[in-house]
Amino acid sequence: MDHLDLTQLTTCVSDLAAQSSSLAAKCHQIDTNGASRTMDKVSPSLAREILQLKESMAATAGKLQRMVQEPPDFLQRLAHQAQLLACIQWLAEFQILAFIPLDRSVPIEDIAELASVPKEHLSRIVRLTATAGFLQEPPSEMGHVAHTPLSTQFVTELSYLDAAMFLADLAAPTALQMTKTTKRFGQSPSPSHSAYNMARGTAAPFANMWDDHSIKLRRQWPAYLKHVVNSQAKSSSSDLLESLGCMDRLQGAIQCIVEVGAESAERAILLARRYPSAQFAVQLSGPAIPGGVWTAGPPDQAQKEVLIAGRIDVSRRAVGSPQPISEAALYILDLSISSLNLGQPKEHVSAELRAHLDILRLNRNSALVLISFILPDTRTGSLEEETMTSLRELCMLQLHNQQLLSFKELSELIHNTNDRMGHLSVVREAFSGTRDAIALEIHYQAHSV
């Protein structure tokens, strides 16, 4: 506190007050019929504005907290986060959240009996999570427990709970093995010399997770990527596609678009609504998982109107295998929302470039669009954006012992994909605002004579 900048403090407080007023005004526009809680009846534009205001408020509040914190505050917050993670893991393991009704409070004793857990343990855990807005013990009903808007979403959208369990069961224990990993393996580049290997006591790299028989783990990993590591990827990758201009050819045309190595059909569904004449082929990554192609990521809503009335075909295709669709207008390889290439970024990209080389040579009107996170050449984003970049980098290091590719490395991989007649070439590029993601439009180019 000795070096507190009063000017910055005043500005920060004013910003937070202004953002709070704006959010309150936006919320007053929402009907009082329950839509304010679920956001399910709010117009997309208003929902987007409210989300942006919430994110701005969280960023400003975080900045204010960092300005005034003392070492004990920092340590107490660390301890609180550690206990919060442990409590949510406990609640999930004993399915406590599912036992609590969404619309009313119930005695803690009843829930403890249903879940066969000690009442005293449950009571203490609820009191801790309630400090973070997750579950509550209503003041007028001591000894009762009820959901909050936050905890409710972990029941209605189970992928949030899957992400939390991956964090508790694997990501956090793995992160805590970094010290031992460095002492034992030093700068070894081997995917088998990661913090993940130390935490799990295995020599198999994290990429072999797909060979694991744990359906739960293979469901939790995509959820963790979606909600934690790549939380902004879908919107940013769609923005990059638009910025690149490669979607213009779809307006009013009967064209085929192939999404290579997808996690689900969600983006194809969005594009199918926007381009009603286009056909889509979604090629899911990874091996088949019991439960069908949707296990790794939703649709539903009657499988999104039976995949927009037949214009979307979903199949599985192994990385680098021959591309069975030879006359598509666009092949979209979006690494920004994939499973971080399963720890083999260069091998993954090279294999897919090679698999599409002949197709692009034989059909010069076709393009491959590659979207990927990259190592930013500069660090000019907000603290929140810096945080996400660091999370991705550490996730790659701890789980895979790998790192993201730089723009230069990515460009070289593309240019070096060649045959006797020519090579792949980047014809257009678009960077994200923070330059930590890029979209590249790739065509086949004949060798110069």
From Swiss-Prot:
Annotated Gene Ontology cellular component terms: nucleus
Cell compartment(s), UniProt: Nucleus
Key words, A-Z: DNA-binding, Nucleus, Transcription, Transcription regulation
SUPFAM superfamilies: Winged helix' DNA-binding domain
Gene Ontology terms for molecular function: DNA binding
Segments of the chain annotated as binding DNA: 108-127
InterPro entries on file: SAM-dependent_MTases_sf, WH-like_DNA-bd_sf, WH_DNA-bd_sf
Induction conditions: The expression of the dibenzodioxocinones biosynthesis cluster is positively regulated by the transcription factor dibT.
Major localisation: nucleus
Domain HTH iclR-type: 78-148
Biological role: Transcriptional coactivator; part of the gene cluster that mediates the biosynthesis of dibenzodioxocinones such as pestalotiollide B, a novel class of inhibitors against cholesterol ester transfer protein (CEPT).
Protein name: Transcriptional coactivator GME11369
